[in-house]
Amino acid sequence: MIIKSIQLSNFRNYEKLDISFDTETNIIYGDNAQGKTNILEAAYLSGTTKSHKGSKDKEMIRFGEDEAHIRTIVEKNDKEYRIDMHLRKNGAKGVAINKMPIKKASELFGILNIVFFSPEDLNIIKNGPAERRRFIDLELCQLDKIYLSNLSKYNKTLVQRNRLLKDIAYRPDLIDTLQVWDMQLLEYGRHVIKKRREFVNELNEIIQDIHSNISGGREKLILKYEPSIDDIFFEDELLKARSRDLKLCQTTVGPHRDDMLFSVDGVDIRKYGSQGQQRTSALSLKLSEISLVKKNINSTPVLLLDDVLSELDGNRQNYLLNSLSDTQTIITCTGLDEFVKNRFQVDKVFHVVKGQVEVIDE
């Protein structure tokens, strides 16, 4: 799949923008704070309805305006899709596919699959379990609408159960209603655990060869899914935890507490890995993500690289860019020196200055 073009109106620092991309390597360069990442953010929004930064809709609307518009033309398996997205200050987002409004984000997922790689992706490895759950969920939700539905229902049930736990502290007679939410939590949670385990196992099979190649065969990276509780024992553990849950007024077992372990040669690299090992593992993860998506949907996702090359040494840069021959890639950076020096193939170049984009090389 490819992004053919993006049109922006009152999005971030862009009053108007109409940009068309090459099918392979696109470079967007310019000084910091000129608007390079905003173009990638618009592309990511078009595939997921959310900002990769976690920004609210109103924060992405140009200062002084009431709404922003993004139009993205996508080509996938010889079929063209037009994705229109309206962001409004009141939070009422509107999305249409080929001029037909959609009611749920799930209707959009799968049309434009995005793999986004930025220096912040080191947080997947370095930070707490929430970052790794977020990574798993974002990818699975793009690939599997049933998973998206079960995850959404699980999260809603979790909120309701936690609210009830707080209410029981003041109204003990409500405790009999806890069983209703427990049954729903178990139903949706088991599906979430099962799919996450399958996803991590599949990703682990792919990532080992990629990481071995990047590290020159010196390291073996293993991913392991670490659920807070196995789906088989979920019901028993939820019952055992009930008194603790009532005391803390929150649900203490379930997939909302899962984690994923990154280990190199048996060592947990979140705790004990060098920054070089963590960067190599993050790169391996993103390249594995591309392969996994391609395997599952029979189409290559679009890769967005946000100022990530400056974080990689020459060997990692070479491996990354030489691995992308069949992948549309949009790269932001502050200059072109690395591309010229290493003679990387570049198909289209854009220069950004204060929200104005100029095509440098057709």
Curated annotation (Swiss-Prot):
It is found in: Cytoplasm. The keyword DNA-binding applies. The keyword Lipid metabolism does not apply. It comes from the Bacteria. InterPro entries: DNA-binding_RecF, DNA-binding_RecF_CS, P-loop_NTPase, RecF/RecN/SMC_N, RecF_2. GO terms for molecular function: ATP binding; single-stranded DNA binding. NCBIfam families: recf. Belongs to the RecF family. This is DNA replication and repair protein RecF. It comes from Agathobacter rectalis (strain ATCC 33656 / DSM 3377 / JCM 17463 / KCTC 5835 / VPI 0990).
